[in-house]
């Protein structure tokens, strides 16, 4: 959370403070985003890389989370890990922008289950493709990459092959 100068208000940012998280619950904001994307597509841009898109839906109850790190803070990822409805926003984004222009999209989607892959890519997926984080997930310890375990080459290889086989099914 970052204070808004000159006010008693704060804004949330999962990444750099110069990158405030946007309130995708707000239909006016979504329309403005779609207008900006379409502006670029109308100029002839052929596609978009979309980072951290899976984080657009938050638990707006903003619960007090138990600290999970040595610093006494709770990981911000816990605000997005079990939230329902992100797919509705992603489908709305696709229909109002990328689909109209047959634009190529590559999205950063992590912590996804194998059975959800076809929702994200393929004929009816939200995006043209996604970055494959399956091998990266091997480096997650109890606190993410902070306490990452060593990665065994055979596990890495098996993970990559399994991931590619799943993609081919979409």
Ranges and model annotations:
Residues 47-52, 104-108:
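A structural signal for short, well-ordered beta-strand segments and their strand-loop junctions
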Residues 25-32, 81-89, 151-155:
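Soluble or luminal CAZymes and related metallo-dependent hydrolases
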Residues 1-43, 47, 53-78, 114-116, ...:
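Substrate-binding/active-site clefts of carbohydrate-active enzymes
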């Amino acid at each position: 959370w970052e204070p808004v100068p000159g006010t008693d208000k704060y804004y949330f940012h999962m990444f750099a403070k110069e990158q405030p998280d946007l309130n995708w619950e707000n239909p006016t904001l979504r329309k403005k985003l779609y207008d900006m994307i379409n502006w670029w597509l109308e100029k002839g841009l052929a596609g978009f890389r979309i980072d951290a898109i899976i984080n657009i839906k938050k638990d707006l109850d903003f619960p007090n989370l138990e600290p999970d790190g040595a610093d006494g803070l709770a990981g911000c990822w816990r605000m997005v890990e079990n939230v329902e409805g992100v797919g509705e926003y992603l489908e709305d984004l696709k229909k109002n922008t990328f689909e109209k222009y047959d634009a190529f999209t590559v999205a950063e989607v992590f912590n996804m289950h194998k059975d959800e892959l076809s929702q994200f890519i393929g004929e009816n997926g939200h995006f043209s493709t996604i970055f494959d984080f399956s091998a990266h997930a091997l480096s997650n310890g109890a606190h993410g990459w902070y306490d990452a375990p060593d990665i065994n080459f055979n596990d890495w290889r098996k993970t990559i092959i399994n991931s590619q086989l799943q993609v081919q099914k979409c």
